[in-house]
UniProtKB/Swiss-Prot annotation:
Functional description taken from the UniProt entry: Required for the formation of a threonylcarbamoyl group on adenosine at position 37 (t(6)A37) in tRNAs that read codons beginning with adenine. Is involved in the transfer of the threonylcarbamoyl moiety of threonylcarbamoyl-AMP (TC-AMP) to the N6 group of A37, together with TsaE and TsaB. TsaD likely plays a direct catalytic role in this reaction.
Residue positions binding substrate: 135-139, 168, 181, 271
Enzyme class: transferase
Annotated NCBIfam families: gcp_kae1, T6A_TsaD_YgjD
InterPro entries: ATPase_NBD, Gcp-like_dom, KAE1/TsaD, TsaD
Family statement drawn from the similarity comment of this UniProt entry: Belongs to the KAE1 / TsaD family.
GO cellular component: cytoplasm
Name recorded for this polypeptide: tRNA N6-adenosine threonylcarbamoyltransferase
Swiss-Prot/TrEMBL keywords: Acyltransferase, Cytoplasm, Iron, Metal-binding, Transferase, tRNA processing
First-listed, main subcellular location of the protein, grouped into a coarse class: cytoplasm
MF terms in GO: iron ion binding; N(6)-L-threonylcarbamoyladenine synthase activity
Length: 344
């Protein structure tokens, strides 16, 4: 058994974790910045970076002490090196480099998206390659075929906004505050998903990509009309999102040879309505459905540590001069898609 220290600081969660190659999470801490960013309705990069700088070092010491592990006991240090808010990414990566240099341990620079892509393998030892992945978060919405560690084939992406961003915008329109995803999901439980006629962008298109900008605009018009209850708007928005997801999956993956498993990851993967719809979609096509525990859906260091474990087993480490990357696609060979390269 080998131990990896994982560090995550790409957005507004500061996190550190110790993860073993036998899938044991020895210790993990996470500090959210929701209260700091709530007055602004979204993440302010400067505030996020400052909070990471204040919290990360004592957090790392805390997980080391909790697990009873010394730096000499570590086998590698893994840190998110992108994509993300560059100030926060640099805080975590520089800290990882310092520890790696001082302890004489390998540095493993992790693509934050790869952390999400592999997170279900931390929780499920039976999940093997290949599998289809729906990656849905505040900054990304992609369908990928995961063929191995570092082997990702992008099948679809968003041409404008990510689904998590659409949830946050809907929450703001409805006065629900930040973060918006959980608030919209909660309000939607009291609404009628068929009450508000909202568009399903790209539905029926032969192209597999997503689009949510038009859906956001339609939510705003529905609210401004004064003709609908907020709960009905939330429920109708959520149902429109589900319909778009299932249609895009059908186009991206459809054929005679479905992947053996469908995995969902990212912050939006915590949405229970979306999970249930995906589970039904997979069952109808004889695919196994896998979703990580809720704690591994949002940004966390355990998934970064696990991605480090996966790469450590393959003897893949990185030089200490590895530079932070604000944009870092999982599939660098994927053809450019209009609007899709903005955040990855």
């Amino acid at each position: 058994m080998r131990i990896v220290l994982g560090i995550e600081s790409s957005c507004d969660e500061t996190a550190a974790a110790l993860v073993a190659t036998d899938r044991t999470i020895l210790a993990q801490h996470i500090a959210s910045q929701d209260e700091a960013h709530a007055p602004y309705g979204g993440v302010v990069p400067e505030i996020a970076a400052r909070a990471h700088a204040e919290r990360l070092a004592p957090m790392i010491e805390a997980v080391m002490q909790e697990a009873g592990v010394d730096y000499a006991d570590l086998d590698a240090i893994a840190a998110t090196a992108g994509p993300g808010l560059i100030g926060g990414v640099m805080v975590g990566l520089v800290s990882a480099k310092a520890i790696a240099m001082a302890a004489g341990k390998p540095l493993i620079a992790i693509n934050h998206l790869e952390g999400h892509a592999l997170s279900s393998r931390l929780a499920d030892s039976e999940l093997e390659f290949p599998y289809a992945l729906l990656l849905v978060s505040g900054g990304h919405c992609q369908i990928l075929l995961v063929e191995g560690v570092g082997q990702y084939r992008r099948l679809a992406t968003t041409i404008d906004d990510a689904l998590g961003e659409a949830f946050d915008k809907t929450a703001k329109i409805l006065g629900l505050g930040y973060p918006g995803g959980p608030a919209v999901e909660k309000l939607a439980r009291d609404g009628d998903a068929q009450a508000v006629p909202l568009p399903r962008p790209m539905l029926g298109s032969a192209e597999p990509h997503f689009s949510f900008a038009g859906l956001k605009s339609a939510v705003l018009r529905a609210k401004e009309s004064g003709d609908h209850e907020d709960a009905d708007i939330a429920a109708s928005f959520q149902q429109a999102a589900v319909d778009c997801i299932l249609d895009r999956l059908q186009v991206a993956l459809g054929g005679d040879d479905w992947p053996p498993a469908l995995v969902v990851a990212g912050g939006v993967a915590a949405n229970q309505t979306i999970r249930a719809a995906l589970e039904g979609f997979a069952a109808d096509r004889s695919m196994r459905f896998v979703a990580p525990p809720l704690a591994l859906c949002t940004d966390n260091a355990a998934m970064i540590g696990w991605a480090g474990c996966e790469r450590l087993d393959l003897e893949q480490d990185d030089p200490l001069d590895f530079r932070a990357r604000p944009r870092w696609p999982l599939d660098p060979e994927a053809e450019p898609v209009r609007g899709a390269g903005v955040k990855a």
